[in-house]
């Protein structure tokens, strides 16, 4: 009998720990979008005088606009994508 009580307790404790019993009330933190670095103004991001263009020189909103319009995005630590 003690074994059954112990197993029931452990099973209910495991369900609570996994969040199966109390599904409401807990919300996860909202993940933040990846940070942008500033690309250079002008046309699409690409080579400049034969050298790759670094991400510098314009505002955050301009960088985001360039990313959405041209599909060429620059992320901190990752370089260009798109």
UniProtKB/Swiss-Prot annotation:
Cysteine pairs bridged by disulfides in the record: 55-73, 67-74
Entry-linked InterPro entries: Penaeidin
Range of residues in the leader sequence: 1-19
Coiled-coil region: none
Biological processes annotated in GO: defense response to bacterium; defense response to fungus; killing of cells of another organism
Modified residues (Serine amide): 81
Single GO MF annotation: chitin binding
Cellular component per GO, a single term: cytoplasm
Cellular location(s): Cytoplasmic granule
Chain positions with Pyrrolidone carboxylic acid modification: 20
Keywords: Amidation, Antibiotic, Antimicrobial, Chitin-binding, Disulfide bond, Fungicide, Pyrrolidone carboxylic acid, Signal
Domain of life: Eukaryota
Family: Belongs to the penaeidin family.
Function: Antibacterial and antifungal activity. Presents chitin-binding activity.
Full protein name: Penaeidin-3i
Organism encoding this protein: Penaeus vannamei
């Amino acid at each position: 009998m003690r074994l059954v009580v112990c197993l029931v307790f452990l099973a209910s404790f495991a369900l609570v720990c996994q969040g199966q019993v109390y599904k409401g009330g807990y919300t996860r933190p909202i993940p933040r979008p990846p940070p942008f670095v500033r690309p250079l103004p002008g046309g699409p991001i690409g080579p400049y005088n034969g050298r790759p263009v670094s991400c510098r020189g314009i505002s955050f909103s301009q960088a985001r606009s360039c990313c959405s319009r041209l599909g060429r995005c620059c992320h901190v630590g990752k370089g260009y994508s798109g």
